[in-house]
Swiss-Prot record:
Highly N-glycosylated. Not O-glycosylated. GPI-anchored. The GPI-anchor is cleaved, leading to secretion into the colonic lumen. Residues 121-170 form the UPAR/Ly6 domain. It is found in: Cell membrane; Secreted. Changing residue 115 to D: In mutant N-D: Abolished N-glycosylation. This is Ly6/PLAUR domain-containing protein 8. A lipid is attached at residue 233 (GPI-anchor amidated serine). Changing residue 200 to D: In mutant N-D: Abolished N-glycosylation. Specifically present in enterocytes located at the uppermost epithelial layer of the colon (at protein level). Exclusively expressed in the large intestine: specifically expressed on the apical surface of epithelial cells located at the uppermost layer of the colonic gland. The gene is Lypd8. GO terms for biological process: defense response to Gram-negative bacterium. Changing residue 154 to D: In mutant N-D: Abolished N-glycosylation.
Length: 255
């Protein structure tokens, strides 16, 4: 009988060890997010890592958030990572990973040296109701055209992206149904198409229309009514870019 009791205690201890979840936890903006994996509370079932590396507006912005999550990953490991290239050498790199049973691996790196082709996608970016002025962007080898509308989980900020992307076909299929949540982000709409032969043209498409959304600004920063033109000054450009990231970071849209 004593042997049975001891075996039961060992089994219970083993279950406790298996059920414990350790995740790296840190949050940074424009700095490195490093931290040791620590044990999560009992309500957490997954580790989540999200990051954005962007040069929209001509300024570098880096955002990272690693945390324990009460959400269950749809698979043992769900990872989405891709870069969107836009006009004027602007880019938006998005990465998010949800893991169960272990801390996420830091494998979100952008592609190295690439060869430019004579194929193109129309590119632009917009925030909430701002205009998205399309311009042609030459693509690198292996890229396809994307049209992405994404927002943070709480709906406080929305971003629209068009351009050339290294997004994989499997990721396109995973996100294309719409309203797909990955980490802190909800991909409202994702379209992937093949690029066309390069031509130099510019068009303006209507702004994002969603009357239920309200403008979100960072405390202490005044923003004028959004109107983006190619002749906008660098000051206006910086204000517009800060507005984009200000609303994104209020959650805690590459992607």
């Amino acid at each position: 009988m004593r042997g049975v009791f001891i075996a039961g205690v060992i089994a219970a201890f083993a279950i406790t060890v298996v059920d414990s979840l350790n995740c790296t936890q840190c949050y940074t903006y424009n700095s490195t997010c490093d931290g040791q994996a620590t044990e999560c509370n009992e309500q957490s079932f997954s580790c989540v890592e999200s990051s954005i590396n962007s040069t929209l507006g001509g300024f570098l912005h880096v955002y990272q958030n690693k945390f324990c999550s009460a959400s269950n990953c749809t698979e043992n490991s769900t990872e989405v990572a891709f870069t969107v290239h836009l006009f004027d050498d602007q880019r938006y790199h998005f990465a998010s990973q949800c893991c169960q049973g272990e801390s996420c691996n830091a494998t979100h790196s952008e592609s190295g040296t690439q060869n430019v082709t004579d194929m193109q996608c129309m590119s632009c970016y917009g925030h909430n109701k701002t205009l998205c002025e399309e311009k042609p962007q030459k693509c690198y080898e292996g890229e396809q055209c994307v049209f992405i509308i994404a927002e943070m989980v709480n709906g406080s900020g929305r971003v629209e992206l068009k351009g050339c992307s290294d997004i994989s076909n499997s990721t396109c299929q995973f996100l294309s149904p719409g309203n797909t949540t990955v980490g802190e982000f909800v991909f409202k709409s994702v379209e992937c198409t093949q690029p066309t032969e390069y031509t130099n043209s510019t068009t303006t498409i209507p702004p994002i229309t969603n009357t239920s959304l309200t403008s979100v600004t960072r405390p202490g920063i005044k923003t004028s009514p959004a109107s983006v033109t190619p002749q906008a000054s660098m000051g206006t450009k910086a204000s517009f870019t800060s507005s984009i990231f200000g609303s994104l970071l209020l959650l805690k849209l590459l992607f």
